[in-house]
Amino acid sequence: MVHLTGDEKAAVTALWGKVNVDEVGGEALGRLLVVYPWTQRFFESFGDLSTPDAVMHNPKVKAHGKKVLGAFSDGLAHLDNLKGTFAQLSELHCDKLHVDPENFRLLGNVLVCVLAQHFGKEFTPQVQAAYQKVVAGVANALAHKYH
């Protein structure tokens, strides 16, 4: 559960309505894989991840980034029940994929940076603070199965 004020929730929702999930998802996941290269081990089936350019233009990275942000969008619609919303994904990432839950926090922070780049002055300190709360809540929900 994420505790947002009415203004924070409105800001998150308003900005998210402008997000191009295809573009931002691929960019966020790609940046995660470039900046934190050890995360690439979970995506060996994606083909060439040998250079930053290869990662950022990899169609499988873009497609999975879109899928990730689709799940994130679902979380935004259920901010009062993030653990329930992400229960199956938490189980999958814990039991089958064995993803270090710290990676969820890293991806959330990368997503905030990508949003800041895309929205510039519209991504005010208040909007950024609200998104930090949301990505922390999502990361916590995804890590829930690990506890």
Swiss-Prot record:
UniProt modified residues of type Phosphoserine = S45
Looking up CDD domains in the UniProt record yields: Hb-beta-like
Regarding tissue, the record states:
Red blood cells.
Q: Give all N-acetylvaline modified positions.
A: V2
Domain called Globin: residue spans: 3-147
Q: Which superkingdom is the protein from?
A: Eukaryota
Tell me the InterPro entries matching this sequence.
Globin, Globin-like_sf, Globin/Proto, Hemoglobin_b, Hemoglobin_oxygen_transport
Q: Which residue positions does N6-acetyllysine occur at? A: K60, K83, K145
Per its record, how is this protein called by name? Hemoglobin subunit beta
What species was this sequence derived from?
A: Alouatta belzebul (Red-handed howler monkey)
